[in-house]
Amino acid sequence: MIFEVKSPILGFESVAKMKLEKIDDLFMKLYNAEGEVPHFTLVNPFLLREYEFDVPASIKILLDLSDAKNLLIANIMVIQQPIENSTINFLAPLIFNFDNLTMAQVVLDSTQYPLYSLNEPIGKYYDKEEAQKGEQAAPVRDSQKK
């Protein structure tokens, strides 16, 4: 699906339309619908950890979230090898409104959200043993870690 960018992705202020493709329940691809860059791997944060934040009023207005029922929150992941070294930006989530095909990036204040990081390793949540068995990587919640 192609989304109109209402509040730009940091560093890519001139990008107006982005295409979102689902890979599986955890991963998605997002790329410029009108050019070659940028392209990102996104993750569903809710499959990895408890994740919650307040959406700023300006973003609610831009995306017309008052009556929206079909929303997606995703975070950008920087891919590394091995995969458990890949990092997730939990401080700048992307919000997608499927009702009107708009999207925006929200930049959270780290002082208000001290448990979120710009570059948190997915290895904190990623079950490497399951991945090595050839199965889809099983998310590991903090409560499951020893």
From Swiss-Prot:
Keywords, ordered alphabetically: Bacterial flagellum biogenesis, Chaperone, Cytoplasm, Translation regulation
Any Pfam family: FliW
GO BP annotations listed: bacterial-type flagellum assembly; regulation of translation
Matching InterPro entries: Flagellar_assembly_factor_FliW, Flagellar_assmbl_FliW_dom_sf
Major subcellular site: cytoplasm
Signal sequence annotation: none
Subcellular location(s) of the protein: Cytoplasm
Cellular component aspect of the GO annotation: cytoplasm
PANTHER family the UniProt entry points to: FLAGELLAR ASSEMBLY FACTOR FLIW
Protein family (similarity comment): Belongs to the FliW family.
Function recorded in the entry: Acts as an anti-CsrA protein, binds CsrA and prevents it from repressing translation of its target genes, one of which is flagellin. Binds to flagellin and participates in the assembly of the flagellum.
Summary of subunit composition and partner proteins: Interacts with translational regulator CsrA and flagellin(s).
The protein, known as: Flagellar assembly factor FliW 1
